[in-house]
UniProtKB/Swiss-Prot annotation:
Record's protein name: Uncharacterized protein FLJ37310
Region (Disordered) location: 1-172
Biased composition (Basic residues): 58-68
Superkingdom of the organism of origin: Eukaryota
Low complexity bias spans: 1-28, 129-138
Organism of this sequence: Homo sapiens (Human)
Amino acid sequence: MAAAGVTAKAGGGTSAAAASLIRARSPAWPRRAVSCSLARGTGAPKCGSDSTPPPPLPRRRSRARRGHLGNGDRPSAGATVGGEGQASQIGGGGGGGGGRRNATGRGRRRRQGGAGSAVKCRRDSVLEPGLASSPGVAPAGGSGGLWSGAGLCSGLGARGFPGGRRSGRDAG
């Protein structure tokens, strides 16, 4: 009798384990189906492995881009503001794209020579504010008033400034 009792208990244990496994497996399927249907929104029947990977991929890519910048939360704010501080530290970049360009490859760093020349020209204009205020310089920049200095800097950087874009392209 004792042997029968042991076998019965063992049998009961296995059945309970099987039931627990079945119960554990059953809620997993509906969860996947609900998640994929919410992700797509169309309610397509093929939602198992095909639909679940696409939503996380773009998120991971964005996180990877932020990680490449190496500043954590700062690059996102810098990119929205314009990234001027980061660009100056890296070597002169155009707007928020400066960090991304430098992170992607070295070739784009060379192309940023034009932006770097503009930064240098800005420094020159700051050192010599008389150029921006002089009336004869305004027509050359293509715009009048306070914007004449910026116009001249951009024009010089693109046309033939020592660190202009042409020199950067020729070097690369």
